[in-house]
């Protein structure tokens, strides 16, 4: 639903602006991506294990990262865990039904994804789908333009993209079960 990111074209432009090589820019992006996915995976593992009453061991999860990135994760992860603990403490009305739930539609859309948490809201007496995000940015709009049809009235920002994602998951649950989200 959005324009594909042309990594080489963008890296060429960034390299020229920063007076470095395209390879250096791509390597920097790869390391940043590895850092982000490692941090996100570790937080998601913590949350999943928290709801399953399991202890989390984080050793060995730093493959491919340098010392600085590992240190940054060790500093950032406790902060993110604190945010999750605050969320949990502030939302005792949300009871975990299932973590890491796979949702998909093999007959029509051929789309599949995974949500972090399916919970029951005791206040509204309804199910809710939650997905925890660790993005660097969480914007509603972006300078990169609008999404493609049928979302062409929405900007390409992370908030809009994740809103669509959760609504697609909602559609799957309601299509294939008797549950309402």
What role is predicted for each listed range?
Residues 1-108, 112:
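Nuclease catalytic cores
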């Amino acid at each position: 639903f959005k324009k594909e990111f042309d990594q080489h074209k963008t890296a060429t432009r960034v390299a020229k602006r920063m007076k470095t090589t395209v390879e250096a820019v791509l390597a920097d992006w790869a390391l940043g991506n590895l850092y982000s996915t490692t941090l996100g995976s570790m937080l998601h593992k913590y949350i999943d294990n928290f709801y399953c009453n399991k202890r989390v061991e984080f050793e060995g999860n730093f493959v491919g990262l340098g010392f600085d990135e590992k240190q940054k994760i060790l500093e950032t992860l406790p902060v993110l865990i604190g945010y999750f603990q605050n969320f949990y403490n502030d939302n005792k009305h949300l009871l975990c039904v299932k973590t890491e739930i796979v949702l998909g539609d093999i007959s029509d859309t051929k789309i599949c994804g995974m949500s972090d948490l399916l919970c029951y809201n005791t206040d509204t007496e309804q199910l809710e789908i939650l997905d925890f995000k660790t993005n660097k940015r969480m914007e509603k709009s972006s300078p990169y333009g609008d999404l493609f049809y049928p979302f062409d009235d929405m900007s390409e920002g992370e908030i809009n993209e994740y809103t669509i994602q959760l609504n697609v998951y909602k559609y799957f649950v309601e299509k294939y079960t008797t549950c309402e989200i």
